[in-house]
């Protein structure tokens, strides 16, 4: 073997060096955030019982053992993944309550930016939790705390919490028909009529 051949065999691969140099450094905070983001998507796309920590870790590009290290297991990871999943406060602070029915109905009909990008889906969490003994009560409590109670505070007046729950019922039903079931009756041709009809019912709840 010539010295030239030895050099060729032992010379480092420049592409490998480039990959190492350009690979972003990953600290504990970044790893934790990646796991949490992957979990939010997984739990909204499949039932809790069907989601494994290995699946989440693979989506996040980390070792499965890190899920337990940072979150203490799947149950605690799920609880953290649904924090702020249904939060209404930031979206409606200062909103014109005389147009609330129209605004929120239009938002539900059009879908959120996250849904359009096929990322986290709060509706998916709600629907899947309804058939899951492991998560039903926790998701219900989270939805009540993050959506129903803050909305009731916006509504004020008599039976505000009941009215907020009725509004939530309208919205969940509408979102299920439109986005989960893809009903052709709620397609583009009839969307405006649907918004007008449902928003009127919601506005009646707002006005008390």
Question: Residue locations for each model-derived region?
Answer:
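Hydrophobic alpha-helical connector segments
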Residues: 90-123
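N-terminal hydrophobic signal/anchor transmembrane helix of membrane proteins
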Residues: 98-103, 107, 198-208
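Short alpha-helical scaffolding segments that buttress acidic/His motifs in well-ordered protein cores
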Residues: 108, 123-130, 167-175
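Amphipathic alpha-helical segments used for helix-helix packing
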Residues: 82, 113-144
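Basic, helix-initiating cap at the start of DNA-binding domains
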Residues: 1-58, 72-76
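Alpha-helical DNA-contacting segments of helix-turn-helix folds
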Residues: 78-85
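Hydrophobic/aromatic-rich alpha-helical bundle segments in the mid-to-C-terminal region
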Residues: 136-141, 151-205
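Short hydrophobic/aromatic patch on the recognition helix
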Residues: 60-71
């Amino acid at each position: 073997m010539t010295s030239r051949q030895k050099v060729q065999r032992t010379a480092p691969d420049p592409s490998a060096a480039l990959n190492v140099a350009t690979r972003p450094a990953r600290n504990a905070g970044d790893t934790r955030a990646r796991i949490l983001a992957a979990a939010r998507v997984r739990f909204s796309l499949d039932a809790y019982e069907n989601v494994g920590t290995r699946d989440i870790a693979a989506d996040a590009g980390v070792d499965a053992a890190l899920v337990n290290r940072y979150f203490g297991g799947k149950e605690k990871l799920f609880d953290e993944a649904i924090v702020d999943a249904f939060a209404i406060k930031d979206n409606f602070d200062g909103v014109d309550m005389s147009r609330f029915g129209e605004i929120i109905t239009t938002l539900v009909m059009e879908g959120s930016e996250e849904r359009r990008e096929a990322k986290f889906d709060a509706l998916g969490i709600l629907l899947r939790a309804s058939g899951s003994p492991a998560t039903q009560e926790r998701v219900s409590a989270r939805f009540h705390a993050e959506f129903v109670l803050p909305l009731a505070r916006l509504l004020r007046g008599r039976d505000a919490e009941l009215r907020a729950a009725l509004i939530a019922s309208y919205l969940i039903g509408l979102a299920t028909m439109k986005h989960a079931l893809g009903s052709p009756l709620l397609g583009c041709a009839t969307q405006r009529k649907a918004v007008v009809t449902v928003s009127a019912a919601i506005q009646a709840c707002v006005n008390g």
